[in-house]
């Protein structure tokens, strides 16, 4: 006799005060080489009217990074696909090892759930006062999932406290996206560190290395993309 188990499935995002939402923002970074005319790329982005940031790659003098964002994931296989398969983007060489994608998510404590999921990530990456960015994926070890909820909360609060301190000082502003099942290397999260100067972004990574989460429960970090925005979609 077979026994069935009732599994509660809830794919909504949850915030404070019983807020719920089925909306979320997808963000993708694609990195290219052999760019000799950034102006043509900017003109193409303006023509296609996509929400995007174009970065100059710090570690490749002919490299660029294209960060795009949309609520509807079909955007990436329609509008964006057509864009990168047309001139001038199709003339570039793509660095697939740096392709990163993730979706906004909630922790259950957000006071303004819609702002957290949809608007804050856009505001952060499109702010002209914060042109510097470090993007990287990470994967936790299985041991983290086996911790009790109380232990997990303690580990995550340590990271959160550091992140808020850097943000309050206007040193670094973070974007945290989930990429379970979306990342080609089976990473769990995609992190963006955004700010007005590069050094504080590097410094927060250094500081995080000392935390329990990074020192004990991270299986892999990177690759790291370091870029400086040369064009951002104007904020609305």
Model-derived features: where do they sit?
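Short S/T/G/P-rich N-terminal loop/turn motif that feeds into the first structured element of a domain
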Residues: 1-49, 61, 70-79, 91-165, ...
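Short, well-ordered beta-strand segments in beta-rich or mixed alpha/beta enzyme
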Residues: 28-30, 56-84, 133-139, 178, ...
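A common structural junction motif
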Residues: 49-52, 83-92, 208-217
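A generic structural motif
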Residues: 52-59, 94-101, 215-229
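Short, surface-exposed, polar/charged, turn-prone segments marking secondary-structure boundaries
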Residues: 56-58, 81-84, 162-166, 204-206, ...
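Intrinsically disordered, low-complexity segments enriched in Gly and acidic/Ser/Thr residues
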Residues: 154-186
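Alpha-helical oligomerization segments
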Residues: 193-236
């Amino acid at each position: 006799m077979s026994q069935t188990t009732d599994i509660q499935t809830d794919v909504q995002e949850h915030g404070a005060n019983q807020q719920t939402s089925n909306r979320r923002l997808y963000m993708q970074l694609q990195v290219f080489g052999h760019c000799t005319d950034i102006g043509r790329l900017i003109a193409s982005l303006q023509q296609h009217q996509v929400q995007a940031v174009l970065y100059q790659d710090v570690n490749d003098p002919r490299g660029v990074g294209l960060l795009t964002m949309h609520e509807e994931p079909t955007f990436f296989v329609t509008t964006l696909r057509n864009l990168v398969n047309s001139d001038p983007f199709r003339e570039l060489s793509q660095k697939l090892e740096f392709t990163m994608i993730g979706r906004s998510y909630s922790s259950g404590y957000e006071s303004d759930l819609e702002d957290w999921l949809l608007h804050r990530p856009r505001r952060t990456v499109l702010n002209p006062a914060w042109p510097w960015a470090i993007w990287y994926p990470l994967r936790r070890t299985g041991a983290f999932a086996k911790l009790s909820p109380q232990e997990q909360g303690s580990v995550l609060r340590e990271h959160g406290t550091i992140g808020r301190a850097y943000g309050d000082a206007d040193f670094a502003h973070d974007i945290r996206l989930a990429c379970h099942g979306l990342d080609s290397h089976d990473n769990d999260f995609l992190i963006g560190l955004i700010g007005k100067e590069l050094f504080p972004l590097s410094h927060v990574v250094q500081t995080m290395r000392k935390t329990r989460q990074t020192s004990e429960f991270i299986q892999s970090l990177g690759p790291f993309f370091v870029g400086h925005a040369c064009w951002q979609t104007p904020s609305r």
